[in-house]
């Protein structure tokens, strides 16, 4: 429900790229929640292979988080080509895992997700510092220029990513609950 309201709010907000990216992020998260809800409500027995498939499909959202963060600190960076390339790097192992049902492709996708998230984390700290300097150089009144909130959000995203990567391999309801608590608490 929350994600659906966010989609509606950012759809009404405007046509700027950042609002549309946040709306896209909320749409993807909303669809993932609906998928999970359908699985939880059904009498379907979630075996390990299906658990991996459910988690693998959730990984396509990781680049969208990066797109939002990049648009915040480097407006205009994202193009359709860059978006397609970043998403393709997640979709290819997902498709190969779906076709072959080999756990190797799930491991590749999870490792890529972790590596991509880690590189994004450190790159964002650099870009946030650079953007902070640019803002201070551009404006004479500097008292209200503070991007520490963005560093905090970035760190929360990274912690959630770490817990989520571990939860991909832990087929356990309790560990899934821990991930949900981290997501809600951050």
What are these regions (language model features)?
Residues 1-93, 107:
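N-terminal low-complexity or simple alpha-helical regulatory segments
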Residues 12-34, 86-87, 109-185:
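Alpha-helical transmembrane segments of multi-pass integral membrane proteins
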Residues 91-98, 118-121:
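Phosphate/oxyanion-binding loops and surfaces in catalytic or ligand/nucleic-acid-binding neighborhoods
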